[in-house]
Every structure is written in structure tokens, then in C-alpha cells.
């Protein structure tokens, strides 16, 4: 009897039918795949994307060149050079972030005492030439100026968790 059962299981490809049963069960369920360029999933306001430097309302940059973000960066992706102004305050002469090194951990954003460096919701960007991965101070300020309203709204929503 056992030999007949084994023969029927082998002849009827029982294991294959069990696999097809699983496939058939999942074939008619709702799809979870998102066709990315055409459909986009919602992004949290806490998403850590492309960096930006912010300015005060009067147009002056917020960064005071304390270099805390440079020190706390685990990937050593941030490089800051500073100069002292005539009134005795320091400001950055160069601020660079190497996006190939950056791991988007958010430590730079958390450590900033004046809320100067932030990570935006921008997740789609590319580089066509060598060296474009280095975000300079001018690029970071331009991103901050362009998306300031969105950055401020996200910071306002997230204020209870800071």
C-alpha cells in the first residue's frame, strides 16, 4: 500500500501541485507592488533626504561654524572651514558634504544648535559628472532657499518630537 501511495505521489507530481496551490492562493490577492516612477508612496515629514542650509528671515545664514555637525558625522562626510567676521562672530567660508560618504543618519541635523543644517524630503537626485556629489555651501543654501516653506512646515509638524 505504501509503495502505491509513493508511486501516485511521484506520478502525479504531488509536490508540484502543492506549490501551485500556494501560488494560486496568492495570485488573486491585492497587489502590493508600486510602479515607482508613475506611482509614489507618501513620504513622512521625518524622511531624511538631501541636505539643505537654512537662513534667518533677514537673509543671513544660520550656520555659526560651531562644527558640531562635522564632529558628530560618523561617515566623516562634512568638511567646514570658518572665518571670523569683524564683529567677532564666526561664519563658514566653506561647507561641503560628500553625498557618496553620507549615510543620511541625521546626526548633523540633531546636533545643530541653530537649526541650520536640515535634511529635506528630496529623494530623487542624480549626478552626471564627477564632483557633483560634493554639495557646496552655495548648493546647500540654494536648496534651503527653494524649499524653505516645506522645511518650515515639516519642522513645525515635528516640533513635539524634538
Curated annotation (Swiss-Prot):
<keyword id="KW-1003">Cell membrane</keyword>
<dbReference type="GO" id="GO:0048038">
    <property type="term" value="F:quinone binding"/>
</dbReference>
<comment type="subunit">
    <text>NDH-1 is composed of 14 different subunits. Subunits NuoA, H, J, K, L, M, N constitute the membrane sector of the complex.</text>
</comment>
<dbReference type="InterPro" id="IPR017900">
    <property type="entry name" value="4Fe4S_Fe_S_CS"/>
</dbReference>
<keyword id="KW-0677">Repeat</keyword>
<feature type="binding site">
    <location>
        <position position="73"/>
    </location>
    <ligand>
        <name>[4Fe-4S] cluster 2</name>
    </ligand>
</feature>
<keyword id="KW-0004">4Fe-4S</keyword>
<keyword id="KW-0411">Iron-sulfur</keyword>
<feature type="binding site">
    <location>
        <position position="69"/>
    </location>
    <ligand>
        <name>[4Fe-4S] cluster 1</name>
    </ligand>
</feature>
<keyword id="KW-0874">Quinone</keyword>
<feature type="binding site">
    <location>
        <position position="66"/>
    </location>
    <ligand>
        <name>[4Fe-4S] cluster 1</name>
    </ligand>
</feature>
<keyword id="KW-0997">Cell inner membrane</keyword>
<feature type="domain" description="4Fe-4S ferredoxin-type 2">
    <location>
        <begin position="93"/>
        <end position="122"/>
    </location>
</feature>
<dbReference type="GO" id="GO:0009060">
    <property type="term" value="P:aerobic respiration"/>
</dbReference>
<feature type="binding site">
    <location>
        <position position="105"/>
    </location>
    <ligand>
        <name>[4Fe-4S] cluster 2</name>
    </ligand>
</feature>
<dbReference type="GO" id="GO:0051539">
    <property type="term" value="F:4 iron, 4 sulfur cluster binding"/>
</dbReference>
<dbReference type="GO" id="GO:0005506">
    <property type="term" value="F:iron ion binding"/>
</dbReference>
<dbReference type="Pfam" id="PF12838">
    <property type="entry name" value="Fer4_7"/>
</dbReference>
<dbReference type="GO" id="GO:0050136">
    <property type="term" value="F:NADH:ubiquinone reductase (non-electrogenic) activity"/>
</dbReference>
<comment type="function">
    <text>NDH-1 shuttles electrons from NADH, via FMN and iron-sulfur (Fe-S) centers, to quinones in the respiratory chain. The immediate electron acceptor for the enzyme in this species is believed to be ubiquinone. Couples the redox reaction to proton translocation (for every two electrons transferred, four hydrogen ions are translocated across the cytoplasmic membrane), and thus conserves the redox energy in a proton gradient.</text>
</comment>
<feature type="binding site">
    <location>
        <position position="102"/>
    </location>
    <ligand>
        <name>[4Fe-4S] cluster 2</name>
    </ligand>
</feature>
<feature type="binding site">
    <location>
        <position position="112"/>
    </location>
    <ligand>
        <name>[4Fe-4S] cluster 1</name>
    </ligand>
</feature>
<keyword id="KW-0408">Iron</keyword>
<keyword id="KW-0830">Ubiquinone</keyword>
<dbReference type="InterPro" id="IPR010226">
    <property type="entry name" value="NADH_quinone_OxRdtase_chainI"/>
</dbReference>
<dbReference type="GO" id="GO:0005886">
    <property type="term" value="C:plasma membrane"/>
</dbReference>
<keyword id="KW-1278">Translocase</keyword>
<keyword id="KW-0479">Metal-binding</keyword>
<comment type="similarity">
    <text>Belongs to the complex I 23 kDa subunit family.</text>
</comment>
<protein>
    <recommendedName>
        <fullName>NADH-quinone oxidoreductase subunit I</fullName>
        <ecNumber>7.1.1.-</ecNumber>
    </recommendedName>
</protein>
<dbReference type="InterPro" id="IPR017896">
    <property type="entry name" value="4Fe4S_Fe-S-bd"/>
</dbReference>
<feature type="domain" description="4Fe-4S ferredoxin-type 1">
    <location>
        <begin position="54"/>
        <end position="83"/>
    </location>
</feature>
<feature type="binding site">
    <location>
        <position position="63"/>
    </location>
    <ligand>
        <name>[4Fe-4S] cluster 1</name>
    </ligand>
</feature>
<keyword id="KW-0472">Membrane</keyword>
<feature type="binding site">
    <location>
        <position position="108"/>
    </location>
    <ligand>
        <name>[4Fe-4S] cluster 2</name>
    </ligand>
</feature>
<keyword id="KW-0520">NAD</keyword>
